[in-house]
């Protein structure tokens, strides 16, 4: 997805979602895709814990988690993870990302 804006529709299936381009893209649907997520450029915002499907996330740019709840997906890559939005968010996956963590709002557990 080489675009910005908000994508509200549900994404399903076994494929991978790839975020490219410098813009900010928000995924707000309750997605069930299983092929994982690759963030190669820009910022990908997840507005709920289901927004990134069930696969692992490779973050080589910026992943913004604008939600509370429990995020089960494993996060790897060289990019930054940002917690925004109200509420407490628990990262329960086997995370190995190296780009640092920014908490701009809410609580990260």
Predicted regions and their residues:
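Acidic/His metal-coordination segments adjacent to aromatic residues that form catalytic metal sites
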Residues: 87
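Surface-exposed loop/turn positions within long extracellular repeat scaffolds
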Residues: 4-14, 24-78, 90-109
